Every structure is written in C-alpha cells, then in structure tokens.
Design a protein with these regions (language model features):
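Hydrophobic anchor at the start of a short beta-strand
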Residues: 32
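Conserved functional loop/turn residues at catalytic and ligand-binding sites
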Residues: 29, 50-51, 106
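Pocket-flanking alpha-helical
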Residues: 19, 35-74, 86-96
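Bilobed "Venus flytrap"/periplasmic-binding protein-like clamshell domains
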Residues: 2-26, 37, 84-115
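Short beta-strand->loop
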Residues: 73-81
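Short secondary-structure junction motifs
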Residues: 27-29, 72
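Conserved residues at the C-terminal ends of beta-strands
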Residues: 58, 80, 110
Length: 115
C-alpha cells in the first residue's frame, strides 16, 4: 500500500481523485491511500517517520527542510501539475467571459498555500 499525503485538496488534482474513485490504480495492481495531512509540518514529519510514503506539493518545503538539515532524506521529484494551479471561479457560468469585466469587482486571491 502507498500512503499519499496531500496538503491541500484542490481541483488541479482532480485526475488523481478520479483515478482513485474509479479504481484505476487498483486495476493496475496499486493500492493507494490518499490522506489529507493536517498541516505541512505533519507532512514532513509523517514522511520522515514513515506514516506516509509520498506527498504532492511544491518543492519549497523540501528546500526549506534541506536548508535546516542538509542530510535530510526528503527529495522533490516529478511534476504533477504542468501549469500554474490557480484558477478563477465565478458564481454563474459566463460563456462570454473577458478579464476586463473583472474591473471594479471584488476578488479573493490565494497568496499562500500549504505545499
């Protein structure tokens, strides 16, 4: 069994959630257990202690861990999301959307994510 920690539940990982729900991994002989980590610190500690085998997220946490401990065994590898994962969501469908229509609107912006 592979235990995967995720720091953040987000739509950019939808293909992986779909693979899990449709049992695509088990159809190929893999048993994957996706667990939502309570916070980035537990993700690091869980990986180091063996409570999780892998996690997805940005490389920054691994880099910070190596800065504190150059002998740290954590490794950042692979690429799950190939583009900027931030998305714009509206209340109503708008097939004629244009960015200029956002002028004067209030937006919520994500500036820190727990990766």
């Amino acid at each position: 069994m592979i235990t995967l920690y995720e720091n953040l539940r987000t739509i950019v990982y939808a293909p992986f959630y779909l693979a899990d729900k449709r049992k695509f991994w088990s159809d190929r002989g893999l048993e994957v257990n996706i667990q939502l980590s309570p916070d980035p610190v537990e993700t690091e500690e869980g990986l180091l202690a063996g409570r999780a085998d892998i996690s997805w997220g940005g490389p920054m946490r691994v880099m910070l861990h190596h800065e504190r401990d150059p002998e740290c065994p954590l490794v950042a590898f692979g690429q799950i999301v190939a583009r900027d994962p931030f998305i714009l969501i509206g209340r109503e469908p708008n097939l004629n959307f244009q960015f200029k229509k956002l002028q004067g609107k209030r937006l919520a912006v994500a500036y820190e994510v727990p990766t």
